[in-house]
Amino acid sequence: MPSLNRVQLIGNLGRDPEARFTANGKKYATFTLAVNRSWKSVTGEKQEHTDWFMVNAWGKLGDFVVEYVKKGRLVLIEGRLQTDRWDDAKGETHYRTTVIARSIQLLDRKPEEPEEVEVAVEEVSE
């Protein structure tokens, strides 16, 4: 049976990307992405909510993000979801879902940058 794990998000970086390394020494970038949504309640009042996503970018894409993408930038991220499971010292099970970015496109523009920059790389696993 076919399967699909793909996500597209447009939002603003909640903090500057941070370079990290796995236990095996593989480098990646991690950051949060704020995606705003709004709707009208049954009474007609505007409601707003921000969903926060953890995003990891590996390899050259991660290097690009750390160097050029900063807090507040509007980006389009395409990638997949990855859920990690672990047990803590008390034996309690925890889960964390992260977006693994395959491409990141800058949607806002600074005067010294081109109108649109897109970087895509092959996916690298831990």
Language-model features and meaning:
Residues 42-67:
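A beta-strand/beta-hairpin structural motif
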Residues 7, 27, 49-51, 95, ...:
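Exposed loop/turn and edge beta-strand positions of beta-sandwich/beta-sheet ligand-binding modules
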Residues 8-13, 33, 71-82, 101-104:
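OB-fold and OB-like beta-barrel modules that bind single-stranded nucleic acids
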Residues 14, 18-20, 58, 82-84, ...:
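Conserved positions in beta-strands of structured domains
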Residues 53-57, 81, 95-103:
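Hydrophobic alpha-helical segments of small multi-pass membrane proteins
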Residues 58-94:
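Beta-rich strand-turn-strand
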